[in-house]
C-alpha cells in the first residue's frame, strides 16, 4: 500500500532577491514522497504567493488527498482531487517518478515525450540601484 509524506526543504538565496512585490532570502520547496514497497517517488512544488499559495496551504492540500493517494489514486484521478498548483504538481511528479522507478523506464518514455535536453532560462535581476543592477547583469 502506498504511503504519502510531505516535507519542506529550504534553500537560502545569496543576498536578497527583491522585486516590486517583495523580497526573499530563501526558496521554500514542498516535497511529496510516495513510497510503495521498495520504490520511492519524489516530486516538488514551490508555493507561489501570487496565486494565494503558502507552504502551509500546500502542505494542507497534500494532506487532504493523502487517503486517496494511499488508496491508489492515480495521476488521472489526481486532476479531479486538487486544483492546478504546487500541491498537485508535487504529487503528480511523485507519481510519475514512482511509476518510472517501478518499471525501470524513464518518466519521459512513460509519458511518450522526447528525451530531456538543456533549455534556455531567464534570470531576474533584483531591484537595486542602477549600478547594482548593471553589475548583476554583467
Could you say what each language-model-derived stretch is?
Residues 1-138:
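N-terminal capping/lid subdomain adjacent to the active-site entrance of alpha/beta enzymes
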Amino acid at each position: 500500500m502506498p504511503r504519502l509524506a510531505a516535507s519542506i526543504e529550504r534553500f537560502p538565496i545569496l543576498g536578497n532577491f527583491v522585486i516590486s512585490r517583495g523580497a526573499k532570502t530563501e526558496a521554500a520547496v514542498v516535497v511529496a514522497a510516495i513510497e510503495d514497497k521498495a520504490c520511492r517517488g519524489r516530486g516538488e512544488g514551490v508555493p507561489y504567493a501570487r496565486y494565494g499559495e503558502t507552504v502551509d496551504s500546500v502542505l494542507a492540500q497534500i494532506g487532504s488527498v493523502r487517503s486517496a493517494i494511499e488508496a491508489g489514486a492515480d495521476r488521472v484521478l489526481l486532476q479531479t482531487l486538487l486544483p492546478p498548483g504546487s500541491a498537485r504538481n508535487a504529487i503528480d511528479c511523485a507519481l510519475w517518478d514512482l511509476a518510472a522507478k517501478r518499471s525501470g523506464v524513464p518518466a519521459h518514455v512513460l509519458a511518450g515525450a522526447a528525451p530531456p535536453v538543456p533549455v534556455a532560462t531567464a534570470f531576474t535581476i533584483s531591484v537595486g540601484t542602477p549600478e547594482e543592477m548593471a553589475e548583476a547583469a554583467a
